[in-house]
Amino acid sequence: MKIEKSQRNLEIDRSRKNDFLYPLIFREYIYTFAHDRDLNRSILLENVSYDNKYSLLIVKRLITRMYQQNHLIISANDSNQNTFFRYNKNLYFQMISEGFAVIVEIPFSLRLVSSLERSEIVKSHNLRSIHSIFPFLEGKFPHLNYLSEGLIPYPIHLEKLVQILRYWVKDPSSLHLLRLFLHEYWNLNSLIIPKKSISFFVKKNQRFFLFLYNSHVYEYESVFFFLCKQSFHFRLTFYQVFLERIDFYGKIEHFVEVFTKDWGDSLCLLKDPFIHYIRYQGKSIFVSKDTPLLMKKWKYYLVNLCQCHFDVCFQPQKIHINPFSLYKHSFALLGYLSSSSVRLNLSVVRSQMLENAFLMDNIMNKLDTTVSIIPLIGSLAKMKFCNAVGHPISKPTWADFSDSDIIDRFVRICRNLSHYYSGSSRKKSLYRIKYILRLSCVKTLARKHKSTVRIFLKRLGSELLEEFFTEEEQIIFLIFPRASSISQKLYRGRVWYLDIICINELSNHE
């Protein structure tokens, strides 16, 4: 009975189907919405959208050409003779892919809304703040023993991406259109997707690629963690019977033969694995307090699961297992890339149950971060805000915007940096970064008005950039009144600002 219930939980929830996504491709407002949404989410990345090309006139022409096609869904061999792709192919593909990314997210949005209405937020696995890593570091970080990390491979064949979406999107026309796009831009004769094609596709269609990539990775991650969680409930069940009764994939013979020989007949070895998982920068990172033997078995388990069921070519020799003590003093995650940027300090929390009662001191770990100056300067240099040594330069690609738009873009970057490092205790490096952005903004405005920085500031005054100095107003503090009749002092402490939508280059810096 318990196994049948687990099997039902493993099945993907298909209660929210949408069979009418394809007609939305011919709606103008979808492309406008996709463009505006992409523009608002751009922070540090150069806006490669359609500031100079995008217009509703182009969209109308695009939709008209799509309507005029008698056979839009064709094979890749006939695409060279198709006038739809021969005319300005890159622009049309980029526009449709962004619109398609918005359309295909509709079933996921409906599932999310329904989950929130039923107050079943636990079932929405994607509702995780990037700052959930900090409580993990404070509570679990000092007690872990081993870390395993490896690159997450791309699917062997493009058709696997389409097959994954078939579970969520029940619209054959949309899936055929997706297949046409993929076959048009990638080489079908290659078993593994070329890295150059991936890089080009990611740069031109970030939203579209991230959606496909996350959908693909989420599938085998969900199965793997389901089995990890269920291992606690099947300790007395024979492993071979356990796999056969769940029957989560067809190629089970080799899998069972390997694991009955290598793991034994029961799940007693899976007792309390304490496995923590992070997916970051295309890597899968496992951290555990188990022995190296169990870590190797979990690694082998994941590799066979992905290769047999999802046709993902994992290379076990590239998944390294090292003592976690090597990483405790050199932690690189979420933009904190310096070896000294993450520190665990002991702090004393004093609590009082009742007024005039005795005080209790509890010692706990406190995560303290410092702003890493070198990676941040590298990110700003990559985005052409400064040179390699941190000297501010103008942003010529923004010189065509209005003055208010230029200032708003720079202020938005500074505000997000302040929010991201709001919980840091040492911010001298952050002040230097904000100085680089302020001076880069002034040089960009001076370049636009064909003037020097000194003359421009003298003419307009320093009030033009006063928004850069409002950092303290953007930082949230928690203020607690002290429950005492003698003193009514207020205690103020640092907290992490959690309203982070997109950090882009900060959290993806290599």
UniProtKB/Swiss-Prot annotation:
Keywords per UniProt: Chloroplast, mRNA processing, Plastid, RNA-binding, tRNA processing
The terms under GO molecular function for this entry are: RNA binding
GO BP annotations of the record are:
mRNA processing; RNA splicing; tRNA processing
A GO cellular-component term linked to this record: chloroplast
Which positions make up the signal peptide?
Answer: none
Query: Which domain of life does this protein belong to?
Result: Eukaryota
Chief location bin:
plastid
Compartments (UniProt record): Plastid, Chloroplast
Question: What InterPro entries does this protein's entry cite?
Answer: Domain_X, Maturase_MatK, Maturase_MatK_N
PANTHER family of this UniProt entry? MATURASE K
Return the similarity comment.
Belongs to the intron maturase 2 family. MatK subfamily.
The entry's function note states: Usually encoded in the trnK tRNA gene intron. Probably assists in splicing its own and other chloroplast group II introns.
Q: What is this protein identified as?
A: Maturase K
